[in-house]
């Protein structure tokens, strides 16, 4: 299934690319944006980051059909500065961040992001990491869960949600996406 990037024309226009631009795509995903960037920078270089090895393999194949002036790094963009220097670049011309969970990750129930279908709670962007959403909801303290919801969401009902999680896990471990969704809704 072909992936169509969101707001492609606006993104390309606002990056103000030149043929020799050095560009970072901090969140490669299915290479939707990067494919179009690579077509614009024939004498430049694209450096793309992603944590999701499944997507990286497909994206390299896609980008290779356009050119070879790119490098894909299986890493979180938090390591961008060091990784870009390792490639020999001191500065870049543009950086794209397309943040969030991809539709491919949501559609793949084995990833544990989709709360419309029964699946094991996983929610890891990088499957090499050990910590899953199941681990977090079942072992983190009330304070830790509240902190996560405060820092990473705009959830105004975080206290009742956390209290529901704590109450539920007294009886049984939370294992699936549907269980968690029902706990949150209750």
How should these model regions be labeled?
Residues 1-186:
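S-adenosyl-L-methionine-dependent methyltransferase catalytic core, i.e., the SAM/SAH-binding region
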